Amino acid sequence: MELTVEPIDIGTERPVVLLNCADAETLGVHSLDRVEIDWDGTTEVGIVKVTDELVAAGRIGASHGFPEITDGTVVAVTPAGQPESVESIRRKLDGRELDSDELGAIVADIEADRLSDLELSAYVCASHANGLSLEETKQLTERMAEVGKQLSWEQPVVADKHSIGGVAGNRVTPVVVAIVAAAGLTIPKTSSRAVTSPAGTADTMEVFCPVEFSREEIRDIVTETGGCLVWGGAVDLSPVDDKVIRAQRPLSLDPPGQVIASVLSKKQSAGSSHIVVDIPYGAGAKVTSLSEARDLADDFRRVGDHLGLTIECALTRGSDPIGHGIGPVLEARDVLAVLEGEGPEPLRIKSLRLADIIFDMAREAGMPVDDRSAADILDSGAALSKFRDIVAVQGGDPDVSRDDLQPGDRTETVTADTDGLVVDVDNQAVSQLARRAGAPNDHGAGVVIHRRTGDKAVAGDVLYTIHAESSDRLEAAREYAAGDEIVRVGGRDEALVERR
């Protein structure tokens, strides 16, 4: 059947076509079926959506996923079958183990946008419900890395650090990168933006400087400073992972095997050789127990060995937020404070421990490393100087101060109702509160924690402050805070929460 193209102004992750009901019936296709579209020697496959009114009979609506088709182009449209990888997804749903070829086909079809949203979601759910074996995780990681753009380095040791996330205010990466680069090691850090959190490392660094660079620009930055703090999404290190993450987001699914494949495929594409993986565990974190964290760490190391990567895992307590601030500007202030010798002690200590692990790994590999400890490098001001160098080369102001980094001016303070000890700071709730306030899109939005677990509190003491950039966002955050105990103070009458 020949149809005339009509561009449709809808953004889609993959090529989608709109067919009038009459044309769909003639072709024998339904919504979520596929059609092959041929024009001028080009062939594309689109996923069908059927409509009564949005396009007329004889025309075919083309989404933004078809950038090369112009208005009025006449195309030949024929029904197309499902990709072969759909059968492999069915096998995984049945609890079968997939081989390297099957996983490779799934990765290739995700990368080429040949799977519908429903099929990709089925793959994610199958991986979550039935798990990925160690062998599947190894093969999946390898295949995901193969389709990404590659960075390569001349140095025998290229350091990296990654956290699996789940802890509010865990902004150790800029501090670690500054310390490690100041010690003379190479650490090209590509980071993510927030998916479900109030700030990713890239969002926080964007407060200081641009973070989107080409691979050539990243190489120049690292050559000049020894490190970088950039957004990995701009260089397509693991495009399949980015698409899988978007499919996981609505149900907050994070299968352990997929987590490992996500992290290590990006690290291999980035050219990293020695990687410390931060695995926070505890109430409210992604990993809830120490035994679960140990199992995940063992699998990280086994998959790393398969890929030729040296992996060390740091199992860290993740029940409480790490910094005082949650949200891009507030976390940036904490980073600068730690680099200046002040700031939240948990953020300082964790950064030092992770940097020292990297130093140990480099020394074991025979690399000449600064004899000083991470604490000595931080306390000497060398890490602050290196951080300012990186900010400058990435196009930011090297003289930026904490006073320059002002959070949103719409504020609300929440105080203790009783005397006692802070017995819990809810990681998930405080992250959700910061998002309600506008983070990460509003860089100045977020939450400042004034009392941590174990601190004494007297009735009337400020427990936390909400910052927003608009009154509407502040009101949304205020309503959320009123319905949850973000920071819990336990007194003698703790058993009775309230009377209603």
Swiss-Prot record:
This is AMP phosphorylase. It comes from the Archaea. AMP binds at residues 166, 192-197, 201, 262, 286. PANTHER family: THYMIDINE PHOSPHORYLASE. Keywords: Glycosyltransferase, Transferase. The active site is at 254 (proton donor). It comes from Natronomonas pharaonis (strain ATCC 35678 / DSM 2160 / CIP 103997 / JCM 8858 / NBRC 14720 / NCIMB 2260 / Gabara) (Halobacterium pharaonis). The keyword Glycosyltransferase applies. GO terms for cellular component: cytosol. The gene is deoA. GO terms for molecular function: 1,4-alpha-oligoglucan phosphorylase activity; AMP binding; pentosyltransferase activity. It catalyses: AMP + phosphate = alpha-D-ribose 1,5-bisphosphate + adenine; CMP + phosphate = cytosine + alpha-D-ribose 1,5-bisphosphate; UMP + phosphate = alpha-D-ribose 1,5-bisphosphate + uracil. Its EC number is 2.4.2.57. Catalyzes the conversion of AMP and phosphate to adenine and ribose 1,5-bisphosphate (R15P). Exhibits phosphorylase activity toward CMP and UMP in addition to AMP. Functions in an archaeal AMP degradation pathway, together with R15P isomerase and RubisCO. The keyword Transferase applies. One of its GO terms (biological process) is AMP catabolic process. It is an enzyme of class 2 (transferase). Belongs to the thymidine/pyrimidine-nucleoside phosphorylase family. Type 2 subfamily.
